[in-house]
Amino acid sequence: MKTDIEIAQSVALKPIAEIVEQVGIGFDDIELYGKYKAKLSFDKIEAVKSQKVGKLILVTAINPTPAGEGKSTMSIGLADALNKIGKKTMIALREPSLGPVMGIKGGAAGGGYAQVLPMEDINLHFTGDMHAITTANNALSALLDNHIHQGNELDIDQRRVIWKRVVDLNDRALRQVIVGLGSPVNGIPREDGFDITVASEIMAILCLATDLSDLKKRLSNIVVAYSRNRKPIYVKDLKIEGALTLILKDTIKPNLVQTIYGTPALVHGGPFANIAHGCNSVLATSTALRLADYVVTEAGFGADLGAEKFLDIKTPNLPTSPDAIVIVATLRALKMHGGVSKEDLSQENVEAVKRGFTNLERHVNNMRQYGVPVVVAINQFTADTESEIATLKTLCSNIDVAVELASVWEDGADGGLELAQTVANVIETQSSNYKRLYNDEDTIEEKIKKIVTKIYGGNKVHFGPKAQIQLKEFSDNGWDKMPICMAKTQYSFSDNPNLLGAPTDFDITVREFVPKTGAGFIVALTGDVLTMPGLPKKPAALNMDVLEDGTAIGLF
């Protein structure tokens, strides 16, 4: 079979202006970036706010293998299949980060015959959103350091600057650096570091802002440092929120592209799901809901991370809550959770499927706690056997959850027709009674305890020495009513990536909190989660090249 990029390059794309006509978007409503990419105008976003809100489908997954379980591919294939059965559908996805694209993923725009296009553009520079976010983040760093250098009127303690620079690459050498070296004209020397762009609070802010004025307000509320008397220093204290908003004035507009089958797609924003909230922009999802009858969106990594954050952090900012949740599972991942080594995942092992099913079962039960109907989608691989598939279907039937096979990677929309029909039937016959896991008035400790005990299945929460000091500090600063964004490994319900399946006898330790007061949530750091990834021994970049005619190769 052709590679993903070969399939993508074989498709005759339609002009994006033609694609978006099917959802009522005219030529004057878009700002073109070439023939096949566009941004949606503010006027159109405002104009559709009075329109009826469609049905929202959230795609999530079980705890993944390192290769991922195909959420983006399944989301795209499901949207194409829904369109094929007569449902007016759009898709709302995150933008890929160039770091993982060049590192381990090699591309993140779906796969096989379920892709968003133009695939090369989306995976590389797209409409420049990542660069604008990087620029805004680093402009803040430059202006902050300049304030300290030019007299430090706010009495900023340079030992307590918490704002980091960013770059959209995996570069472990930049995790800890010292800036201002050389001479007094180079600024005040201090410790600093780089995060990857998608870990920037500005990315999270962009994805939660509801309009330009809300973006500016959120930017103004970013905490960047503390003064010598431990008072938080905000962007608004530096009086630079206007400049940062100016840099991002076009970035906030959602990007329009298409799938292989011509389904309109809004691809916008891309915060990490293990260290941020892991969902595409509120603006893109909200606008899609007013343009289409059905909207398919996804949340990063497993349901314990991305879906929990979608439901507890993003959903309160949307015009509606999910009408159905689709949990993507693969037999290889279930076998891994059942104790099979990575090298043996292609071998039939029905007993391992049974053992690993506990992971899927917990995710199903967790999503049901939110009052939303659940469907399981089995992302089919050629190594899957009839016995394994039959076993998984029986196990799903035993817990009364709808389940369908899907082969959208290989067969495109046709491979997702049964799944699409089942999802549509569930939405039409079962009501969603969404409720959050915790209340805003709960303390930070109470919110984390509910997440750990009700979603992860853990026993207790321990707070390290630094976290204990911060709990009082955050309460004194009035930050304790914000939602919690848990930063932990994506591979396990616990904070130990090697504890697979559905563990129960474990505790979670929160070592530190990070205030994301602009985004409007508090990050709780557990385990060894990194905000700047490193590259593997053989990065995907080694297989990438460009031919003399400009054709890209190696993007998987």
Curated annotation (Swiss-Prot):
Gene Ontology biological process terms from the UniProt entry:
tetrahydrofolate interconversion
Query: Carries keyword Nucleotide-binding?
Result: yes
Arranged from A to Z, the UniProt key words for this protein are: ATP-binding, Ligase, Nucleotide-binding, One-carbon metabolism
Q: Which family does it belong to?
A: Belongs to the formate--tetrahydrofolate ligase family.
- Pathway the protein takes part in: One-carbon metabolism; tetrahydrofolate interconversion
Domain of life, source organism: Bacteria
Name of the protein? Formate--tetrahydrofolate ligase
Q: Which reaction does it catalyse?
A: (6S)-5,6,7,8-tetrahydrofolate + formate + ATP = (6R)-10-formyltetrahydrofolate + ADP + phosphate
Task: Report disulfide bridges, numbered on this chain.
Answer: none
- Look at the named UniProt entry and state the broad enzyme category this protein falls under: ligase
According to its UniProt entry, this protein's organism is Streptococcus agalactiae serotype V (strain ATCC BAA-611 / 2603 V/R)
NCBIfam families, from UniProt? PRK13505.1 (NF010030)
> What EC number(s) does its UniProt record assign?
6.3.4.3
GO MF assignments = ATP binding; formate-tetrahydrofolate ligase activity
Entry keyword annotation includes Cell membrane: no
**Protein residues bound to ATP:** 65-72
